[in-house]
Amino acid sequence: MLEVFFLGTGGIMPTRERNVPAIALRYKGEIILFDAGEGTIRQMNTAKLSPMKVDKIFITHFHGDHYLGIPALIQTMNLWDRQKPLHIYGPKYTFQFVQNLLNSGFFRPGFDIHVHELGETRLKFGDYEIWSFKVEHGIPALGYVFKEKDRRGKFLKEKLREYGLEEGPILGKLEREGKIEWNGRIIRLEDVTGPRRKGLKIVYTGDTEPCERVKLFSERADLLIHEATYLNPGDRGDSYHSTVEEACDTARRAKVKLLALFHRAFRYSYEDYVEEALKICESLGVRAVVPRDFDVITFKSGTWELRNLLEERE
């Protein structure tokens, strides 16, 4: 199971109804943060997500609405006596900006902070990988892919009977080692399992104008979280942002299963934006949602569901 928490869905500045960008992925007990705008620690507290379970923060770029929540996160971790290291990843200048943040007050964390400046790369972490790719925002900026490793197929009962195998430690050994000797025969894992199951693929663009690299890295993603700051090109002007139609076009061409539109400009109310945005997506044949703060998309057993944490508590 994987959960995607939309802690902040607005852009540029906070409003009464939405905070600035922060996306949290919860996977096998770990919380991975993508961007951390101001107020992210408060949003995490409201969502009941512990910052102590965050080992990695991936920053897309250094405009304030995407990174100014980092100092408060670090200080909170320190107050809670964090011991394990924190890893912060981002584009060129990440080391410089993190150093500036840590030097901005009378404060020194009691745990190690490791800073990683990335270009386009592929990072491996146990059961998943993070890919970084360049986007177009007028400054050094990255998008990210969370890619779960493919999983083995399900054990086939008829094949287990054929080879005289039963559930228990022997199947655990077969799964760990890939093959075993049993009753004088060599049995391979693929002999008794179905087709391998594709791991989940989640893509987060950060801020970007339309670019082909987003389409390339989003191919057949389960979820594409694409900025769609503006409803129409006339509102955009010369800014390096995308419209709803441009985000939908990318998702359609990449054959994305689900598109989440975020980072809408503060000029739009949620009601006005979502009505127009979903009309555009429907006209292009794209399945889409417009998350609010504290919406959660849960992926489990090949399906997904959307819920809102605050509504659940009413």
Curated annotation (Swiss-Prot):
Where, in this chain's numbering, is Zn(2+) 2 bound? 65-66, 207, 263
SUPFAM superfamilies reported in the protein's UniProt record: Metallo-hydrolase/oxidoreductase (SSF56281)
Name the Gene Ontology molecular function terms of this record: 3'-tRNA processing endoribonuclease activity; zinc ion binding
Q: Where along the sequence do coiled-coil regions lie?
A: none
Q: State the free-text cofactor note.
A: Binds 2 Zn(2+) ions.
Q: Which residues form the active site?
A: 65
Stored CDD domains: RNaseZ_ZiPD-like_MBL-fold
Highest rank taxon of the organism: Archaea
Q: Which reaction does it catalyse?
A: Endonucleolytic cleavage of RNA, removing extra 3' nucleotides from tRNA precursor, generating 3' termini of tRNAs. A 3'-hydroxy group is left at the tRNA terminus and a 5'-phosphoryl group is left at the trailer molecule
Q: How does it assemble?
A: Homodimer.
NCBIfam families, A to Z: PRK00055.1-3, RNase_Z
The record's comment on protein family reads: Belongs to the RNase Z family.
Its recorded name reads Ribonuclease Z
Species, as recorded: Thermococcus kodakarensis (strain ATCC BAA-918 / JCM 12380 / KOD1) (Pyrococcus kodakaraensis (strain KOD1))
What are the leading ranks of the lineage? Archaea, Methanobacteriati, Methanobacteriota, Thermococci, Thermococcales
